[in-house]
C-alpha cells in the first residue's frame, strides 16, 4: 500500500492543534512529528492548511439504509467533505452486508414506529437482528407532523426499551408535542438530542435555555443536526452560541434532498463554516466533528483521533473564499464570504478524495 506523507500542516489530533508532518504506512499512522524526511509514494504539501483526524458525522441518511426519499450515496456525501465515518439516523432498510459494503465506516440508529401515542417495536426488533452489532441506538421522530405522538408517553416507552437493550436514543425534536426540557428530562446520559436549534414550537430558547442547562447537568448530548436550514433557526443558533450553549456534536443530517442544493456544496464543511460564522472557535468546531462524536458512538478507540498507531483516516482542510449564503425556513439569513473546504481525504491509508 502507498505510503503517504503530508507536510507542513497544522495538525488536529482530536484534542489539540500543533504543527507537524504526518506519515502513513500499511493503513496506519506511522509518524507524527516535525520535519519528517521520507521517500513516500505520495507527498502532499499542507502549508497553511489543517490536517485533521477524519471527521465523524453522527447524523446522516444513507442510500439503501434510509428511505428512498431521503437516502444519499454515502461515499459521495462523506469523503469530499473530509468525513470518514458516519452514523445513519433512522435506519429502516438494507442489512449488515450492505453496511459492510460501504467504503465509509458506519454505525446505525434503527427506526421505531409510534402509533396512537404508543411505541411499536415490531419493526425495530427485526432491524436490530438485520444490522447486528452495527446497530448501537434507536432514532425517534418525536414530531407531531411525522408520527402519532401527543405527549411524552411514547418517548418514555422507547427510552425504557432502549435501556433494556443497552442502546442509546437519538431524538429528533422539531415539532415535538412537549417542551424540550421535558424531552431532556426523559433521556439518560449519553442519549442524543438532535436539531437542537430548530425554530418551531418548544424551542431551545424557552425559559432561558432551560433544556440546555438540564442536558449539560445530565450528560445528554446536544447535536446540532443542522440539515442546512431546514431544522435550524439561525437566530436561535446565534443566541445559543452567544449565551455559551454550544453543541456537543456538529452533524449534517444530509439527505438526497439537501445535498444538491446550495450549489451542491452542502456537507460537513458547510456546517463547520456555519458554526465558525456564529462564533464557535476552531478548537470547538473540530472537536465537535472528530473526537466528540466518536466518543458518543463508543468508537473513540477507532475513530476521531489522529495518533501514531491508529487507523490512517484523515483529511486536509483549507479556509478559503468558499463562502455561503443561507436563508432558514423563518426567513433569517446567515452568510459568510469564507468557509472550510476539504482538499484531501485519506481513508484506511488510501487517498480517497483529492480536490
Kindly give the residue locations of the regions a language model identified.
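Histidine-rich, glycine-flanked metal-binding segment
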Residues: 1-52
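C-terminal cap of metal-dependent C-N hydrolases
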Residues: 9, 311-355
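Divalent metal-coordination and catalytic microenvironments
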Residues: 9, 27, 48, 59, ...
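Metal-associated gating/positioning segment near the N- to mid-region
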Residues: 46-102
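Active-site gating loops and adjacent loop-to-helix segments of metal-dependent hydrolytic enzymes
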Residues: 53, 76-84, 105-110, 130, ...
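Short, acidic/polar
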Residues: 67-77, 117-130, 177-183
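Active-site core of metal-dependent hydrolases
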Residues: 140-239, 244-261
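His/Asp/Glu-enriched, well-ordered alpha-helical/loop segment
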Residues: 236-319
Amino acid at each position: 500500500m502507498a505510503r503517504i506523507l503530508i507536510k507542513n500542516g497544522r495538525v488536529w489530533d482530536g484534542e489539540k492543534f500543533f504543527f507537524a508532518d504526518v506519515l502513513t504506512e500499511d493503513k496506519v499512522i506511522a509518524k507524527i512529528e516535525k520535519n519528517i524526511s521520507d521517500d513516500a509514494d505520495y507527498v502532499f504539501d499542507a502549508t497553511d492548511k489543517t490536517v485533521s483526524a477524519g471527521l465523524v458525522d453522527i447524523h446522516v441518511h444513507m442510500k439503501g439504509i434510509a428511505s428512498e426519499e431521503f437516502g444519499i450515496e454515502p461515499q459521495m456525501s462523506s469523503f469530499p467533505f473530509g468525513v470518514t465515518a458516519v452514523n445513519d439516523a433512522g435506519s429502516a432498510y438494507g442489512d449488515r452486508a450492505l453496511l459492510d459494503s460501504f467504503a465509509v465506516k458506519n454505525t446505525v440508529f434503527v427506526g421505531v414506529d409510534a402509533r396512537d401515542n404508543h411505541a411499536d417495536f415490531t419493526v425495530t426488533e427485526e432491524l436490530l437482528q438485520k444490522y447486528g452489532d452495527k446497530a448501537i441506538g434507536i432514532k425517534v421522530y418525536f414530531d407531531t407532523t411525522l408520527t402519532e405522538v401527543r405527549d411524552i408517553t411514547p418517548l418514555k416507552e422507547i427510552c425504557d426499551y432502549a435501556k433494556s437493550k443497552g442502546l442509546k436514543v437519538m431524538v429528533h425534536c422539531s415539532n415535538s408535542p412537549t417542551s424540550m426540557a421535558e424531552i431532556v428530562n426523559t433521556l439518560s446520559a449519553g442519549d442524543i438530542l438532535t436539531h437542537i436549534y430548530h425554530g418551531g414550537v418548544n424551542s431551545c430558547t424557552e425559559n432561558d435555555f432551560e433544556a440546555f442547562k438540564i442536558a449539560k447537568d445530565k450528560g445528554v448530548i446536544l447535536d446540532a443536526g443542522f440539515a442546512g436550514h431546514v431544522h435550524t433557526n439561525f437566530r436561535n443558533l446565534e443566541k445559543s452560541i452567544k449565551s455559551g450553549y454550544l453543541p456537543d456534536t456538529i452533524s449534517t443530517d444530509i439527505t438526497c434532498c439537501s445535498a444538491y442544493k446550495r450549489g451542491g456544496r452542502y456537507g460537513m464543511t458547510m456546517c463547520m463554516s456555519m458554526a465558525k460564522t456564529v462564533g464557535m472557535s476552531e478548537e470547538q468546531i473540530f472537536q465537535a466533528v472528530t473526537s466528540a462524536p466518536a466518543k458518543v458512538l463508543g468508537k473513540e478507540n477507532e475513530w476521531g483521533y489522529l495518533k501514531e498507531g491508529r487507523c490512517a483516516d484523515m483529511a486536509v482542510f483549507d479556509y478559503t473564499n468558499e463562502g455561503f449564503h443561507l436563508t432558514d425556513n423563518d426567513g433569517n439569513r446567515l452568510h459568510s464570504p469564507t468557509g472550510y473546504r476539504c482538499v484531501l481525504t485519506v481513508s484506511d491509508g488510501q487517498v480517497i478524495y483529492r480536490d
